[in-house]
């Protein structure tokens, strides 16, 4: 197996056209059990390592693509298979740095991790800095669709209300609200100022 770039250059009448295509020749699929204790999604192992697990039944190949490999499905990023689950270990990550990534499934389907806590969308460029400061830019021209984001070395959230006591789950009333569609400012600060029970 291996990774290859096929490059073509054509010249005619003083004009030159160049094109290329990425091809990988696959070796044997690595079959290995998902390491003990891992759950589907992003598993943070330490400051520089994550293990990714994806449930994808009846698939033949799954690759991890992202900022760490310039969004190219190199054979070194082919996930190991364990029945209907696929897994991969990413190492040498920079603590605290956000990495966008996706799964390339059977060469023609590209998806974000379904369990990710943060995504990037091509439409994100319309989000004002005041609404989301320092939003990681979408990888324009490198991929398409929604991407997942992982980040090792995240700081734990400091809870400011130490006296909060959550009610029993059976007494909760939960509803979903898409802030983007609910208020023009698209931010949580305006939402909490608008709804008087926060």
Where on the chain are the PLM-derived regions?
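Exposed beta-strand face motif in extracellular beta-rich ectodomains
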Residues: 2-6, 97-99
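C-terminal edge beta-strand
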Residues: 17-28
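Coil residues (strongly favoring Ser/Thr
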Residues: 19-20, 47, 155, 194
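Extracellular ectodomain segments of secreted/surface proteins
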Residues: 26-53
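Aromatic-rich carbohydrate-binding modules that target alpha-glucans
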Residues: 46, 53-98, 106-132
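Aromatic- and glycine-enriched glycan-recognition loops and surfaces
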Residues: 82-96, 180-198
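Core domains of carbohydrate- and sulfate-ester-processing enzymes
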Residues: 109-161
């Amino acid at each position: 197996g291996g990774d290859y770039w096929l490059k073509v250059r054509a010249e005619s009448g003083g004009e030159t056209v160049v094109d290329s295509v990425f091809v990988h020749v696959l070796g044997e699929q690595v079959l290995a059990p998902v390491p003990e204790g891992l759950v589907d999604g992003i598993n943070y192992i330490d400051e520089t390592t994550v293990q990714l697990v994806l449930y994808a039944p009846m698939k033949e190949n799954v690759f991890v693509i992202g900022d760490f490999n310039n969004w190219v499905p190199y054979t070194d990023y082919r996930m190991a298979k364990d029945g209907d689950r696929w897994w991969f270990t990413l190492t040498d990550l920079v603590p605290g740095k956000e990495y966008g990534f996706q799964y390339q499934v059977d060469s023609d389907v590209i998806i974000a991790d379904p369990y990710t806590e943060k995504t990037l969308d091509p439409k994100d460029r319309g989000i004002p800095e005041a609404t989301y400061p320092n939003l990681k830019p979408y990888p324009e021209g490198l991929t398409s669709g929604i991407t997942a984001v992982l980040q090792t070395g995240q700081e734990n959230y400091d809870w400011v209300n130490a006296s909060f006591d959550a009610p029993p789950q059976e007494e909760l009333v939960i509803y979903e609200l898409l802030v983007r569609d609910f208020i023009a400012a698209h931010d949580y600060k305006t939402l909490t100022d608008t709804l008087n029970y926060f």
